[in-house]
Amino acid sequence: GTGPVADLHIINKDLSPDGFQRPTVVAGGGRDVVSIGRAGDNVTIRF
């Protein structure tokens, strides 16, 4: 989508080795967003 873009730093000591899929709170967001990726990946969040 369009709008502001920010660098996101997601820190979670309990990430499983095969990755993660969890709800992500985005400031100013009014919709549910889920971040999906593997441990150690950069995360792309699409609106």
Swiss-Prot record:
Plastocyanin-like domain: residues covered: 2-47
For activity, the cofactor(s) needed are: Cu cation
UniProt GO BP: lignin catabolic process
User: What Enzyme Commission number(s) does the record list for this chain?
Assistant: 1.10.3.2
Reaction catalysed by this enzyme? 4 hydroquinone + O2 = 4 benzosemiquinone + 2 H2O
Q: Which subcellular locations apply to this protein?
A: Secreted
Q: Which domain of life is it from?
A: Eukaryota
What does the UniProt function comment say about this protein? Lignin degradation and detoxification of lignin-derived products. Has highest activity towards ABTS, also active towards ferulic acid and guaiacol, but is not active towards tyrosine, vanillic acid, 2,5-dimethyl aniline, p-anisidine or violuric acid.
- Assembly behavior: Homodimer.
Extra information = On the 2D-gel the determined pI of this protein is: 5.3, its MW is: 59 kDa.
Q: What is this protein called?
A: Laccase-2d
Q: Which organism is it from?
A: Cerrena unicolor (Canker rot fungus)
